[in-house]
């Protein structure tokens, strides 16, 4: 059968996902032949295989993502308690053993629970879902773009238990926004360390499951996140440094959030639209206003006030937030002069330089001069905006509290 044969086709080391599937199909075979009964009508091997494939389809085809789901699922629900009462925390190394113990409950409950979990996890990744509101889906997509994946342990638990927890769409949305603000600070400052995050979210889940009904879940989440969040001083310092070299992906995210904050339906641009190119995955990319190459073009040497000043700016300011923006198809801007970057058009006559309609570029269009002082000024202004946008209050969730 397809179930048995595709396990043996590949001569590569089996992943955790493959090994767990093998255990599942072996148990389904035993149950079906009647040598091992769980008291329920057994699931056929074919049906078990089909349901397993459905679960994987919900998770997408990246094996690392599939494995991450199994870890997060275990840490959110801890489906099997250890006999001596110790709590097992799922890691890459013990995953197969933990899921072996989970399978002992029988194939049917294992697959049913896992499929419910996979549906919730898919919703947490921002895939279209009936389980949550459209607004929450949009917010969850944003959280993933802010590299907030470790928060999915909590979201998985909340989406599966939305009904029993009496969690409204509105409060779920607040929690996703709290997580986004937390992860923006975390990923820009590096605090708290990545290794602490998994256990922290597992503990938040435990706290919620043991809390009195009248406690607002967003308050539990906010209080825990605030205890470990980077303060404003640290956040400012990290935002004011060579942010592009420290974390280009997060730089792209915060530039996009600054631009998105002022978008209306009429002026909407999808800054996350994908291209088919490996090198430039996004249609909109980060543009250095003062070019980042070692050979400074003549027009820029003049604009910076001479060779020495230009070299200093290259060493000290080129990768700072104030010198960065977003443009579409930026390969064609590169070393052009400031004037040309402002007014550049594509072959069909549309502005694709700084006159591209994004609010973060409007101030650039209004000036004729760009130098180190301008970079410093614009950095300070954007940092102020970001500290407000991802404030400690928004992590506390207090912005949405009555």
Residue ranges and their predicted role:
Residues 166-188, 231, 343-402:
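C-terminal, well-folded lobe of enzymatic/effector domains
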Residues 18, 23-24, 29, 147, ...:
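Solvent-exposed, flexible loop/coil residues
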Residues 17-20, 26-261, 389:
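A cross-family structural signal marking well-folded subdomains
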Residues 15-18, 330:
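Glycine-rich, histidine-containing beta strand-loop boundary motifs that form or position
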Residues 22, 27-50, 305-332:
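Charge-dense polyanion-binding interfaces
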Residues 214-364:
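Betabetaalpha-Me/HNH-type nuclease active-site subdomain
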Residues 2-7:
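Short, small-residue-biased leader/transition segments that mark boundaries at the very start
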């Amino acid at each position: 059968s397809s179930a048995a044969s595709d396990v043996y086709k590949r001569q590569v080391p089996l992943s955790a996902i493959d090994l767990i599937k093998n255990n599942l199909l072996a148990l389904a075979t035993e149950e079906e032949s009647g040598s091992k009964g769980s008291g329920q009508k057994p699931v056929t091997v074919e049906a078990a295989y089909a349901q397993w494939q459905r679960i994987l389809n919900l998770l997408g085809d990246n094996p690392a993502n599939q494995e991450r789901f199994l870890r997060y699922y275990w840490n959110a629900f801890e489906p099997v308690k250890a006999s001596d009462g110790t709590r097992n925390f799922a890691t890459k190394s013990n995953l197969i053993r933990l899921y072996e113990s989970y399978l002992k409950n029988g194939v049917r409950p294992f697959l049913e629970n896992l499929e419910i979990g996979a549906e919730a996890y898919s919703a947490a990744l921002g895939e279209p879902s009936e389980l949550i509101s459209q607004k929450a889906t949009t917010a969850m997509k944003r959280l993933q773009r802010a590299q907030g994946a470790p928060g999915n342990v909590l979201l998985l638990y909340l989406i599966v238990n939305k009904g029993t927890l009496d969690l409204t769409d509105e409060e779920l949305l607040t929690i996703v926004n709290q997580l986004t603000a937390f992860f923006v600070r975390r990923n820009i400052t590096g605090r708290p360390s990545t290794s602490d995050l998994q256990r922290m979210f597992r503990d938040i889940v435990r706290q919620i499951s043991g809390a009195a009904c009248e406690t607002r879940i967003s308050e539990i989440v906010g209080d825990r996140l605030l205890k470990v969040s980077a303060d404003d001083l640290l956040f400012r310092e990290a935002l004011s440094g060579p942010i592009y070299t420290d974390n280009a992906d997060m730089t792209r995210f915060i530039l996009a959030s600054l631009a998105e904050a002022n978008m209306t339906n009429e002026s909407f641009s999808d800054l996350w639209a994908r291209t088919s190119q490996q090198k430039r995955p996004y249609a909109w990319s980060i543009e250095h206003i003062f070019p980042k190459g070692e050979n400074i073009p003549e027009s820029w040497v003049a604009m910076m006030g001479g060779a020495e000043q230009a070299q200093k700016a290259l060493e000290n300011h080129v990768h700072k937030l104030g010198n960065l923006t977003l443009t579409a198809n930026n390969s064609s801007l590169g070393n052009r002069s400031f004037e040309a970057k402002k007014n550049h058009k594509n072959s069909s006559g549309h502005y694709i330089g700084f006159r591209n309609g994004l609010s973060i570029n409007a101030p650039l269009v209004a000036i004729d001069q760009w130098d180190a002082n301008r970079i410093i000024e614009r950095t300070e202004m954007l940092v102020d905006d970001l500290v407000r946008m991802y404030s400690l209050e928004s992590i506390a969730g207090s912005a949405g509290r009555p």
